[in-house]
Swiss-Prot record:
It comes from Yersinia pestis. PANTHER family: RNA N6-ADENOSINE-METHYLTRANSFERASE METTL16, SAM-DEPENDENT METHYLTRANSFERASE. The gene is rlmF. InterPro entries: METTL16/RlmF, rRNA_lsu_MeTfrase_F, SAM-dependent_MTases_sf. The keyword Lipoprotein does not apply. Its main location: cytoplasm. GO terms for molecular function: 23S rRNA (adenine(1618)-N(6))-methyltransferase activity. It catalyses: adenosine(1618) in 23S rRNA + S-adenosyl-L-methionine = N(6)-methyladenosine(1618) in 23S rRNA + S-adenosyl-L-homocysteine + H(+). It is an enzyme of class 2 (transferase). This is Ribosomal RNA large subunit methyltransferase F. Specifically methylates the adenine in position 1618 of 23S rRNA.
Amino acid sequence: MLSYAPENAYQRASTMENKKVFPKEKSGLHPRNRHCSRYDFDALSVSCPELIPFLAPTAYGDISVDFADPLAVKMLNKALLKHFYGIEYWDIPADSLCPPIPGRADYVHHLADLLASCNGEVIPKGKNIALLDIGVGANCIYPIIGQREYGWRFTGTDIDSHALSAAKMVVSMNPTLKNTLRLKQQKDPHAIFEGVWAVNERYDATLCNPPFHGSAEEAAATTRRKLHKLGKNEVAAKPVQNFGGKNSELWCEGGEEGFVSRMVAESVAKAQNCFWFTSLISKKTTLPAIYHALRYVKAVEVRTIEMAQGQKVSRFVAWTFLTPEQQAAWVAERWA
């Protein structure tokens, strides 16, 4: 067991007085989420010894990493992916998005429930189930989790060639991903599906974590607020993203609302080639505009699935153009 004892008796007594009792499980996470319990840093350090230098005692007497340190967050993710998902090699460029894995896993599990709701409450599994990850990034988080949990096959797209190069290395170094994750570059920064979705390709679902902000300035302001909440009161003029992120990952013209609205518009051309289109929606205020866009394109069915990670509430919107009869035919052909 790892030990991080205070230096003297006074510190030990002070630490015990300040020790905060945390719940054993994180509230709100999906019941199948492997991260419902608090991080077991002893076990994670056994799986990934590189994590050990980033561990330190907190003011409350437990052990954690500095979530304002991008290297610490990256190493925590590396340890989680190795310990829970069997990923032997995982590395991303310093300026790439390093997302919190528990929340990403929740999206995958709730998406599995969405598919199950159309299949007699049975989750369709295996390589016959094909998903399209828009903005896969260097981290490949959704394909890693989806393949490990449900055996799904993924196509991941991105506009960033450097991110895709890093993603290709992750795929090549992990046998479980070699035949289950295909990567494509989106060469048109204004397109989402066009150019990466062949005419004859069919997907059981799409998923996406869209750029959140409408400008680089807005993204930087959000970073400063996050660092302040983490106790970093002296914030640099150009702060480092604690979870990383290049411009294309963090912001785009029109922000989240503009990006997802364009996705809705493009989905019409692929209406019969996909069962469920989905996208995360971080801002609740974005929903009315997305619902309006979906009414305009005459989506047959729209669902909003809420997720909670502690006090944070997020959701994804799902839509389909398939009628109930077409849905039944799809299930019989692909999921039986």
